[in-house]
Design a protein with these regions (language model features):
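Membrane-embedded alpha-helical bundles of multi-pass transporters/translocases
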Residues: 1-171, 177-178, 184-187
């Protein structure tokens, strides 16, 4: 982004940090409300799937921006990042359902560490398959940075595939359905 999409590294770094700030503000505003709605209405899994799809969509969209398409790239980044952060909120909400109270920290730590291992494996695959080869695989163009942009599609697919076990096998515990007006109070 800072070297190809933005006009220079200084402007690119400034704009990227603004994208992160916008993400943080959106997540800070959405998390309490969405969390209360999901907890009180019994929709944690639905929202986990929804926000994960938003994250995957944002990652996929990052393939398309060309040099100087700063706004498009930032919007795609913010979409993906908000999706990831909001998905994390709902993923964390499942911890009491899947781990005994005294093991929640350990299970959470394992989850994060497996996530980082998966991210490192995806990074290595991206480097080996797309970025480092002299002649990129899949006939991707180095001139238009397609070989680098394609890593976003790979990450979107990677994330989608490795989210499936969670979607299929993690069960949501019982929730207390909200009385009218309690969602606002709870948020």
């Amino acid at each position: 982004f800072t070297q190809v999409i933005a006009e220079n590294e200084i402007v690119g770094t400034l704009l990227w940090s603004r994208g992160i700030t916008i993400t943080a503000l959106l997540v800070a505003l959405l998390s309490p409300i969405m969390g209360a709605v999901a907890d009180r209405g019994g929709y944690r899994k639905v929202y986990l799937i929804f926000w994960t799809i938003i994250c995957i969509l944002g990652s996929f969209l990052l393939y398309f921006p060309q040099p100087s398409q700063v706004v498009f790239a930032l919007i795609a980044f913010i979409i993906g990042n908000v999706g990831f952060e909001m998905g994390s909120v709902f993923c964390n909400a499942f911890l009491p359902d899947i781990a005994p109270k005294d093991k929640i920290g350990r299970v959470s730590g394992y989850g994060w560490s497996f996530g980082y291992v998966g991210g490192l494996i995806a990074l290595i695959l991206g480097l080996v398959l797309f970025i480092n080869p002299e002649v990129p695989h899949f006939n991707l163009s180095k001139e238009s940075f397609e070989h680098i942009r394609a890593t976003n599609i790979m990450v979107a697919i990677w994330f989608a595939v490795f989210c499936l076990p969670t979607f299929l096998f993690v069960k949501q515990g019982k929730t207390d359905l909200s009385e009218k007006g309690m969602v606002v109070k709870d948020s």
